[in-house]
Amino acid sequence: MAHLKLDTLHVQRSPRGSRRSSPSSGRSSACSSGSISPVPIIPIISISHDGDESESESEIETEPARLFQRRMSTKCTNNLAAIIKEGFLLKHTWSFQRWRRRYFRLKRNMLFYAKDEKCDVFDDIDLSDLCYFECGIKNVNHSFQIITPTRSLVLCAESRREMEDWLGSLKTATAPQRPRGDSFLIEQHDILSNHHHWYATSHARPTYCNVCRDALSGVTSHGLSCEVCKCKVHKRCAAKSIANCKWTTLASVGKDIIEQADGIIMPHQWMEGNLPVSSMCAVCKKTCGSVLRLQDWRCLWCRATVHVACRPQMAVACPIGPAKLSVVPPTSVHSISTDDAWDVASPKGNFSPLLVFVNSKSGDNQGVKFLRRFKQLLNPAQVFDLISTGPSLGLRLFRHFEMFRILVCSGDGSVGWVLSEIDRFNMHKQCQVAVMPLGTGNDLARVLGWGSSCDDDTHLPQILERYESASTKMLDRWSIMVFEKAIPVPKTPKMSISTEQEAMLTGMVTSANHHLRFIVETNDTQTLIRSTRNLCDTVDDLVCRISEHHKDDEQLAVKCDILRQKLNMLLDALQEEEIGAHSGDDLIATIRSLIARSIPVTPGSNAYLLNPNISIEKTEKDQINTKERRNSRSLRSSEKEALQCRANSVKRAIYNVVEHSEPGRPKRYQRKLSITPFEALKLPTASGESTPCTSPLPIIPPINIISPTMETSRLTCISPLPDTRRDSVDENFFNSINLPAPRQFADSRRSSGVEVIQEIEEGANGETVYRKSRMSLTGGANIDDAGNRLSPCSDAGENTPTERKVDFLRVPIHTGEPIVDPLCDYRPHEVFERTYYMTREMDKGKEKDKEKDKPVEIDKEKDTCVEKEGSMPAEKLVHTCNLQVPGVVVTPNPQNVYSSASITIIDTDAQTTTEQSSSDDLGGEASDVLSAISNEECSVASEIFDKQDAGQTVGDIIQNMDASNFTHIDSPETSDETEAMPGESIMDDISSVLGHDITYALQDNTLTDDTTTLCSEHAGPPKPPRKKSLSALSRTQAHPRRRNSSPPRMARLARMDSDDNPQQFGFENIVFEIDNRCDDQKMREPPRYCSLAQFVEGNDIARQSFKQLMLEQHRGGDNDSDYPEHEQTPTNKGANLLATTSEDELSTQTAIKIEIQDIDATVRNLNSSMKPNTILTTSTSPTKKSGHGQDVKRITFDESCKKESFDDVNPNYPQISVVVRPPTPLRGDCIKPTVSLLPVSSGGAMTVSMTCSGMLGVRAMNASEIRRHSSHAPGLAVREFDKDKDRRHSGFNPNQLTLDPEHARFLSSSPAASRRISCGSLFKPNEALPNLQTLKGSKSSLFMGSTLFGFDHLASAEKDKEEKSGKDKEKTPTDETNRKLPIINPLVRLPNWPNLANGGGFISKCLLANADTLCAAVSPLMDPDETLLAGYHEKCVMNNYFGIGIDAKISLDFHNKREEHPEKCRSRARNYMWYGVLGSKQLLQKTCKNLEQRVQLECDGQRIPLPELQGIVILNIPSFMGGTNFWGSSKKDDIFLPPSFDDRVLEVVAVFGSVQMAASRLINLQHHRIAQCQSVQINILGDEEIPIQVDGEAWLQPPGMIRILHKNRVQMLCRNRSLELSLKSWQEKQRQHSISIQRDASSTASEHANSTDEVISERECYVLLNFIEAVSSLVKWVKFLIISHPALQHDLYEVACRASEALESIHPQGKLLEGPSLRTKLVEVIDSSRQLYDDACTLLRDRGHSLILREDLETKLSAALANMEMELKKCSVQKCIDGKLRAYFNVLAPNEESDGRRKSRPFWVRLRSGSTAGQQAFKPPLTNTREAANNWSVNEVVTWLETMQLSEYVDSFLKNDIRGKELLTLGRRDLKDLGVVKVGHVKRILQAIKDLSEN
């Protein structure tokens, strides 16, 4: 029974297949399994016995137990063997053509499949004799078939890539075992194995199997075809075929190798049968091949076909075929060396191998056809599929070729892939890349001339010829460098408390902020009490709840205590405010008494001073806060400000506590995810009220605890360096430890700078007097505020002036009372101006109270003050004290300011070496950035501005950017040790606009060398004074601070010659050279540099940064001058100054010399207007050369210094030149002081040369100003102050910048580092600062294209300068060679292109104009060569274009669509349709709207103001997204250069919307051009990703910075159509000529070989006479050549004599021979004349360069050789039947001269085309035109037939005498009458006749 069941089971399973394995294999597998069978043993034994019996009967169906044996073996094998690949595939079932999903598992030589992976039973297939192939030509469904001797499976993969993976895995599973199992050896084995690569196909004609020789089955002859050699087999015969595919290497040639003396010969490789239609035998020229059987042969290389009988007569060597130049012969590839490259032996002759990469997926899988076609034409080893192998394998194999070409058959993305691999292998110099367009866009192929698409592979041989004749051009490639601000998403909860408790905690913080705001803003007592009580309860509850969850956290406990203390201080401030409010005027006295009792005396030997490592104690902090309160109470509303400070302090403490309770959260996310970002409280202020701002200290937290708001994220994106150092610092780092910073890098607000010793003493009038002493530079003495040396142990009342030190910050101010600022060490200097103005107002108010009965005008006050100063020049100043911010030091002596009615000169460089913010340098007008922001953005009116009824002020300050101000890059100026001070509202408003980082840049006192604002006004008549006036701001600092002090001169001199690294100095610090326009002598000064901080990895500052300073005294002199005042001048005409300087002062003084151009005329004009008692006194000025040969620098105020209107300029005003010696930080000689003052009347100008010691004096109110900038200033500009400051010109900007040409030339040549933001983004300094001499013509300035910079001044100045100097030379037009990049579109300057910020207006202009100054503190010193790309990585390489915005969004959507539905994107037309649909979608959605708010664009370092746009495109080639010329034209114009891909220039255009992108495909748009530049930077702001595409490949880019830099250049092959036409015409001519010679020679030979009469015909006789003439002439001139040059070869003379003797033998005694003997004799003549011709040509070719021939001899010899060549072509020597050689002449050779007869063209046609006589001489002869064909003879018609390979109809055409005229009129019926019956032949002849007629 059991046996029957088994049989029944087997019968049911048998129809699944007839595959049977041998019994032996069944036994071996059963025995090797080693497991117990679940079925009984007896059936298994019987099974084996039955199998042995049926061993020879494979078709017997009785094998009962075989199924069980196979299943058990499969299960055990699956558990033991290694799996190569597994996964699901679709298996084709033969019933109803359905597909089933099956799980396949591939192992070594075995394939298993089942329904799913969990099945225990798998069907197995033995792969020992495997054949696999693709199903179909295009193979759209990614199917392949597996054929073994027993099974055949059709499988389908999801994608072509997966199919390629399975085929590769099958190849690996069946490949022999090798020591190295990498993919390269697998591909190498595939290349060298000569195995066929099958694919299933059908045939249109009968085809026969190359294995069994039978016809393929079916009407369509369906079978398998090898994609390389076109071998045809049945599917059942594929496994039996031998490996005789096309050869690849010398080893694969095998036994067919032919070796000769010259080397290895390339033999033919024959394939039998299945010849193409109308194949002709290469030997007998007859048709071969058959559709009836497999016969005849074809060569796989040269494509020659021969009969079986003719094959032995075929030449042995294979000519390789039409693509010989591109083919790598297998005989040249010997082996693969150890470096995975071929050992190549270059073949003889021309050889330019072609490496082909084909993307089989491109063009709707068109790449598959091209891949197979290329393998058929070329060596299969030089054709690679990018999908399966990639470019690396082919490039490695071709590495040893000296030069080769690469053809990439794909789209732009694959081209970029190949070029990237070329970069990796560094093979730019040895390869040239061509592109065959198979993709959708193909922009690069369009530009290179290869068209938009290539779909037909039938003309591939002709296409290869085009690539062989291509020319080479260089393609620029650009690196896309990306600096991403990656923010990881936190995975854990950010706080240790639960979510509910976190919400409660957030509510508490919000409530506390609410109550704090009520406390600060309310005026209601009840509300104040209620909010205070609620605040205390909330803080207590908050502290309790947080402490419960963090009981063991000691730091948190400390922070909670700090919070309670700050809350108590807030309550104390409230109490003080209430006391002051009720006590009225007693408030100040009460506060003074409290402060006096609370401040302890600080001893000189403080523990902090002795040990800098000890942090600042709490008492010191309280002392600072008390002092600040004491100072702030002297102003109106100071109580509110103090209360505001305390509230902000409490708020910050709350934030610190909450942040510390979130240890798991990154610091930059803590505040964002839990509570709102910290925002300082502000005082409510009316718009018209002037709120005093006395405190400069920041109210925002330090940089390391700033939340990543929008503002800060924008700024962090600007810095090219990663912000890990800033973000990684603990927020409490500076709270707990006070690091000992080096003095050069010390923070001015920390005690780690220069230590301060404070002493308090009681003054004579009962006031408390503070005296501060500071350690001297050498450490040997202490210096007080007045600059006097103090003994280390001096008492309070002792002050011995032992040594005078240099004043680096001295600001003398006229006032009557000393104002002491004890907090100067803890404040930056940016609100110094405001503090001074407020103090001045207070002083003026006191003076007015004292002098109520005597109204005094301001001018008289000032004159009186000046007179007092002049009367006591040597008197020591009693009320001199240090002015640190915000205190004011009062000094009555303005020694560096001269004011008059016509001009005011201020020296801001002299010893004011402290680094200042941009807010310090501007005065009463709205030229300050802070003032501008306060005017336009803030509700707080700053006291920087004049009040509404105030007169015009001249109290502006120009910041001094001395390069000696060393600043640590990460200097902790924002330490929490500095408490928030009053006056924070204005800074909050700034921070809301600029962001916290820029606000810190404003508050920091460490700016670099980038002053950007110049203020000046032309001297004019005095304006009426306003009611109120603010005096000029002045500064003093008696103690030199280490950080800001200028080193002594001798230290610089000693270091001058020892600096070997010039790159360490800032390139703006080099003092620029400016010519003196009024003096012939040009003075120079040696360059001065600023030292950079040296950094080492892992540390902050290297030892090299700390340089020891030395002091050396220099001798100097005192210059005294008195300047009498003019009697009738209403304003101050001069200042009586006595500059008493010490030796140390002289070492750092700056001399300013102002000279009058045309001084004689000026003096004459002045004398006529002045009274006789006017005295002009000038001090003796030494030689301009001073110091150690140091030259004086001279700045000229020429026409560029006129005011902007240029209307009311007095032509009598002389030109003023300023000679400056700016202080040098490291190098330079001593500068001797020069004092020379010349007061003049208001109607004229004046000359001033004065010594400035760093002090600023009072200027006249109504005087014009001329300000001298330090060496970092970009140039000199003029600012016009309007009477009404609110009414300005449309293009007026008080912060306008202009560049002096000399300064620009200096900047462009400077190589070193800078802290400029604008220069830091430059990639080479000289690329962004062009020579401004070319500014007017090319509009390619650094600032051209923006209305922020007044180039009208520069243009006018240049024009006037040319007129003055009399330069009337004609200037040549500016071409592209003279244009400097970047070239900015002038449209950018128009109003419709808004400014950088959306708000626009004055604020944006100020921000951009002062960008370098604002960002200096947060910008590290950037070296353009070293730190430029720090933190960047190369994302990709751009070859075509870069897009950000809408175009990238469309490309990204298309890419996602193609990945999701590949079947919808398989044709080019469908892809274009999808692009249109997605573009229309963007028209409605506008996902990239307002892109200008999210990105910033810089071109060559210049910030470009962007309009409202949706995208930015950067073009390298003039083709964009499918052939659009998005630039708008391909030619140059007045502004831009012509676009090209080999000029290292990028074109930047704007994309305003999808409508514009669509319209640009139809018309050329040019309004959207932005710039042409050499480098681009794009800053992505915000937190969202933005779509970006490069060459059509799109992705989403996170926020950060993108830089596009030039990477390299690659050689590209461009189509050369002119060369193609020339080669085509030449080849056509050669083919016709050779065919004609062969036909005539064969016909003549056959005609005369059979005839008995060997007499030369009459026509031949005519040719013979021409031949004799040519030989005679050649012999004559060759003999004459040898005689003229005896040094030449004598054997040539012998050859000439032999030819002459042979020639004499055919016409003895002047008569030609007759009969057959003539032809025999002619053979000798022909041979000797040919030898003479060859030897003569060889001699001239070898020795022609050294021969000096006479002109007539050279001409005649050349003509003789040319005639001889033509005559030899007409001769032929043939062997007759009798064995003799006879000569024959070709009388039917075509005439090479073109028919000169042409139809006369009309007169107007000839006139329009011009003279064509010279042009026609160079045109090739047109032999296939209608005119030429109309004159053809019968023989020429026959030649025409033979060129079309239709020689079988020659006899019919000869018989009917068909000439050219009849040929052009032949029709289909006529051809039938002539015997042309084949339809294909009729069509070919008719088409050829049509072509002739059309030509």
Swiss-Prot record:
It is found in: Cytoplasm. It catalyses: a 1,2-diacyl-sn-glycerol + ATP = a 1,2-diacyl-sn-glycero-3-phosphate + ADP + H(+). Residues 1172-1184 have a biased composition (Polar residues). Residues 82-175 form the PH domain. Residues 1832-1895 form the SAM domain. Keywords: ATP-binding, Cytoplasm, Kinase, Metal-binding, Nucleotide-binding, Phosphoprotein, Repeat, Transferase, Zinc, Zinc-finger. Residues 1-37, 781-801, 1012-1053, 1113-1137, 1172-1191 are annotated as: Disordered. One of its GO terms (molecular function) is zinc ion binding. The keyword Repeat applies. It is an enzyme of class 2 (transferase). One of its GO terms (biological process) is phospholipase C-activating G protein-coupled receptor signaling pathway. The keyword ATP-binding applies. A zinc finger (Phorbol-ester/DAG-type) spans 195-245, 267-318. Its EC number is 2.7.1.107. Residues 20-37 have a biased composition (Low complexity). Its main location: cytoplasm. Residues 349-485 form the DAGKc domain. Residues 1-10, 1113-1128 have a biased composition (Basic and acidic residues). It comes from the Eukaryota. Belongs to the eukaryotic diacylglycerol kinase family. Phosphorylates diacylglycerol (DAG) to generate phosphatidic acid (PA). This is Diacylglycerol kinase eta. It comes from Drosophila melanogaster. The lineage of its organism: Eukaryota, Metazoa, Ecdysozoa, Arthropoda, Hexapoda.
